Amino acid sequence: MSFSRRQFLQASGIALCAGAIPFRANAAGQQQPLPVPPLLESRRGQPLFMTLQRAHWSFTQGTRAPVWGVNGRYLGPTIRVWKGDDVKLIYSNRLAENVSMTVAGLLVPGPLMGGPARMMSPNADWAPVLPIRQSAATLWYHANTPNRTAQQVYNGLAGMWLVEDDISKTLPIPNHYGVDDFPVIIQDKRLDNFGTPEYSEPGSGGFVGDTLLVNGAQSPYVEVSRGWVRLRLLNASNSRRYQLQMSDGRALHVISGDQGFLPAPVSVKQLSLAPGERREILVDMTNGDEVSITCGEAASIVDRIRGFFEPSSILVSTLVLTLRPTGLLPLVTDNLPMRLLPTEVMSGAPVRSRDISLGDDPGINGQLWDVNRIDITAQQGTWERWTVRADMPQSFHIEGVSFLIRNVNGAMPFPEDRGWKDTVWVDGQVELLVYYGQPSWPHFPFYFNSQTLEMADRGSIGQMLVNPAS
């Protein structure tokens, strides 16, 4: 292996300094505040404008890198809508290539889901009116362009989408955006020496980087009051799954999954977050001690040195976010609510069963995506049992539906996974009870796909026709 004098000096510097300086950010003084995306709300029938364009962003101090984003910033604003509203959304593509967008987890008819059937060429717009009829949930919007989704999401075409309803407004939980209720968008990237993201499609599987980002920042901190803090977690990485825990071992209180609140809070010490998956957690900060969210073991000194000469998939730092309590009085002082939602009882029985196979190679059930082929035909208002198997562990998403996890490799799902979902980690076999609540049409089908974005780009996508209820 040959390498430059500059690379040798950089590697030598790491080897000399790594033992003396913790490689987390590295010290508190070098941490930057958590960037909180601006909030864009639907009110009084006003349209929401979403401009897809080039921008610049600072991933490392003192540098600015070219990125893509929405409304002039890396990633995009947080969208907040209300159940019962009809929201007009105006996408404007000011990029030099075709883009299609979707809101993952949104329950609307097929023609309004976006995706390949709603491709925007450069300088084109798309303006759907979205009927918001689902319960409160944390969703996300992102590029969904055939053969380009992985690159476009990596570039920055993604953001959080919040649905609120009467229940979410009245629950005694934090709900002041940017004060005690924060979006936490987790990604991994590979940055060059100038702080610019690098992307190269892997020969197999999905992209993994060595630098962890939250809302576009490395190892950020956020100042919070001494009370309950609500974190809305989104894994917007191309393929990496995270196992989250608190640095001092305190509990994470899970209150919501992909499609809304759990019946009751679930306290866990470790929490899985698969690509495309969303979870909401509450953290108790009443003791006034600083604490961090982490995600496993960081790279060793040898791994860090090796990373200067070849791409690494091992995270340099596993620090996700530091919570720093202040002397401010909490906005929410109540105890954790015992119940969030009444327990729902499934009405009706599955009308049929399906087997879905995700292999090491691209494709679903041995077939690559074909825009002219409908793979599944179902009926609105019915249930089906899906058994999903994966040879290579990966995340799996179904558009336009909600599902319950019946079992994971023959065992009951964890309590935090027993709410309504649209995305699931598959390592072996999972059995799902899928409910078709929305219709789609042949030219505007729903999609089910690997949430390893590179696998989806290579053809791990199926198309689903849901006939309207008669």
Where are these regions (language model features)?
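Histidine-centered copper-binding motifs that mark active-site loops
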Residues: N26-A274, I281, N287, V320-D334, ...
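Short, surface-exposed ligand- or partner-binding patches at beta-edge/loop junctions that are enriched
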Residues: L139-H142, G288-A299, W441-T452
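Active-site pocket scaffolds in enzymes
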Residues: V103-G105, P111-P116, M120, V254-P265, ...
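Terminal connector regions
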Residues: D289-V320, A456-G459
